Amino acid sequence: MTTRSLSTFLTSFLLVSLDWVSKLVVLLKSCQLSPHSPALLYSYVWGHFSFLIVPSFNEGAAFGLFAQYKIPLLIFRVFVILCLFLFLGIKFRSLHIRTRIALTLILAGALGNVGDILFHGKVVDFLSINYYSWSFPSFNLADAFISLGTLLLVGHLYFSKEDKKYF
């Protein structure tokens, strides 16, 4: 394993750790404040915009989709993680740095959420953004990593001026 590939997997591990620690802190703080129901841990209001930290649980995929298919969804997620590991392991040297960063973020986010499912039976979400009466579905750092990685990957694939060898 090269130094670069080791740093990629170490970065992924650190991001997963950051995600899990943030969820643990939110859950512990929530239990201290209100042991029987989710507690508002933090709020920031700026005009009609608000940012809240309130623990919630998601048994499905993004936005709670497919919650009734827990086992197939878990199998699919594990399959995607294994594919990402294999792809990064096999193609690592030939990947563009932006592709590597994007896939590392996606891998870390996927691992963070699968870890939640294995340990809690559901994903722990706690970040909430609201504007007027509109609320974006709650999310966590793992979701943010997946979203950022996807945006980086799509941006790189779409806007790359280099030869069209993406992977």
Swiss-Prot record:
Protein name, entry field: Lipoprotein signal peptidase
Membrane topology: Multi-pass membrane protein
GO biological process, one term: proteolysis
InterPro entries, per database record: Peptidase_A8 (IPR001872)
Keywords of the record: Aspartyl protease, Cell inner membrane, Cell membrane, Hydrolase, Membrane, Protease, Transmembrane, Transmembrane helix
Catalytic activity: Release of signal peptides from bacterial membrane prolipoproteins. Hydrolyzes -Xaa-Yaa-Zaa-|-(S,diacylglyceryl)Cys-, in which Xaa is hydrophobic (preferably Leu), and Yaa (Ala or Ser) and Zaa (Gly or Ala) have small, neutral side chains
Enzyme Commission identifier(s): 3.4.23.36
Biological role stated in the UniProt entry: This protein specifically catalyzes the removal of signal peptides from prolipoproteins.
Pathway: Protein modification; lipoprotein biosynthesis (signal peptide cleavage)
Active site, UniProt feature: D125, D143
